[in-house]
């Protein structure tokens, strides 16, 4: 167009959005896919927005960060619970395995102070009691 207004007719655009042929080949990706996560960033962002006071603004990177932390902690707990299930020679993770995994790890134990339903209790026998039982066994063996 004469006068320098509008798009130039020289073939190259002066900026802005790309032409239709280049944009059509790109497939839309979610925030989770871009960050390489399995957990949904959009849902976490929505929960963050809903649960803040006075409907504060939440940045996209904050939601991705919180999602990554949640995914990491979940993977850590599931790995330890899977190992506990494998040690007991079963193929299904139960609340008992989750309890053993969380209470067996010092850092997770301090982080997760909740009571796990149907988790049971950790097996623990006081050392003083163990010594008495062992001494009785030795005494019986010497007498017999």
Curated annotation (Swiss-Prot):
Belongs to the histone H2A family. CDD domains: HFD_H2A. Acetylated once deposited into chromatin. InterPro entries: Histone-fold, Histone_H2A, Histone_H2A/H2B/H3, Histone_H2A_C. The gene is HTZ1. It holds the Pfam family Histone_H2A_C. One of its GO terms (biological process) is chromatin organization. This is Histone H2A.Z. Keywords: Acetylation, Activator, Chromatin regulator, Chromosome, DNA-binding, Nucleosome core, Nucleus, Transcription, Transcription regulation. The lineage of its organism: Eukaryota, Fungi, Dikarya, Ascomycota, Pezizomycotina. It comes from Gibberella zeae (strain ATCC MYA-4620 / CBS 123657 / FGSC 9075 / NRRL 31084 / PH-1). The nucleosome is a histone octamer containing two molecules each of H2A, H2B, H3 and H4 assembled in one H3-H4 heterotetramer and two H2A-H2B heterodimers. The octamer wraps approximately 147 bp of DNA. H2A or its variant H2A.Z forms a heterodimer with H2B. H2A.Z associates with the VPS72/SWC2 subunit of the SWR1 chromatin remodeling complex. Also interacts with RBP1/DNA-directed RNA polymerase II largest subunit. Residues 1-36 are annotated as: Disordered. The keyword RNA-binding does not apply. GO terms for molecular function: DNA binding; protein heterodimerization activity; structural constituent of chromatin. One of its GO terms (cellular component) is nucleosome. Variant histone H2A which can replace H2A in some nucleosomes. Nucleosomes wrap and compact DNA into chromatin, limiting DNA accessibility to the cellular machineries which require DNA as a template. Histones thereby play a central role in transcription regulation, DNA repair, DNA replication and chromosomal stability. DNA accessibility is regulated via a complex set of post-translational modifications of histones, also called histone code, and nucleosome remodeling. Residues 1-18 have a biased composition (Gly residues). It is found in: Nucleus; Chromosome. SMART domains: H2A.
């Amino acid at each position: 167009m004469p006068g320098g207004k509008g798009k130039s007719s020289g073939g190259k655009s002066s900026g802005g959005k790309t032409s239709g042929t280049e944009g059509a080949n790109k497939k839309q990706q979610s925030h989770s896919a871009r960050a390489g996560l399995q957990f949904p960033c959009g849902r976490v962002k929505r929960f963050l927005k809903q649960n803040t006071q006075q409907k504060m603004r939440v940045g996209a990177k904050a939601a991705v960060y919180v999602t990554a932390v949640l995914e990491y902690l979940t993977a850590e707990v599931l790995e330890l619970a899977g190992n506990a299930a494998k040690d007991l020679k079963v193929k299904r993770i139960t609340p008992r395995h989750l309890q053993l995994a969380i209470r067996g790890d010092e850092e997770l134990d301090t982080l997760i102070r909740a009571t796990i339903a149907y988790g049971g209790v950790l097996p623990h026998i006081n050392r003083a009691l163990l010594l008495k039982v062992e001494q009785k066994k030795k005494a019986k063996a010497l007498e017999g």
